[in-house]
Amino acid sequence: MAATMFRATLRGWRTGVQRGCGLRLLSHTQGPPDYPSFVESVDEYQFVERLLPATRIPDPPKHEHYPTPSGWQPPRDPPPNLPYFVRRSRMHNIPVYKDITHGNRQMTVIRKVEGDIWALQKDVEDFLSPLLGKTPVTQVNEVTGTLRIKGYFDQELKAWLLEKGF
């Protein structure tokens, strides 16, 4: 009997919980404690709204003359009447990017192409052929709406798309 009591005492000592003390205290509690009431203030919510991120990127401000000092230019107001359309990125830039794969394969990617992407490929090939002296190697992905061109032509293609009105 003494050994059993000694083991029970050690068990309580190891876990830090004495036998039977938790149930007795829980049964004698009253209802929920009375907390002080609160006042809902909508005047200070403007400070919270400043911390919340914007749900969409605002439209760029109107400028007196274009291109702006950063080089940004808005798209032409009536969009060009072409069988394809190149939508701007969410930051209102032309979606033409450089891409490098396998360590040395340099590609230019035109994203967000809607409509007849094959007509865009033909126009890009017609535009780049005099610059290269040969027809550039291109890859069309109709599902994602991207056109990949072998080589770095991002600045030339951005200027060409701006000239077309995108």
Curated annotation (Swiss-Prot):
Subcellular compartments: Mitochondrion
Listed Pfam families: Img2 (PF05046)
Disordered: region residues: 56-78
Ribonucleoprotein recorded as keyword: yes
UniProt keyword terms in alphabetical order: Mitochondrion, Ribonucleoprotein, Ribosomal protein
Main location as per UniProt: mitochondrion
Example GO BP: translation
Gene3D superfamilies per the UniProt record, alphabetical: SUI1-like domain
Name of the protein in its database record: Large ribosomal subunit protein mL49
UniProt source species: Pongo abelii
Gene name tied to this protein: MRPL49
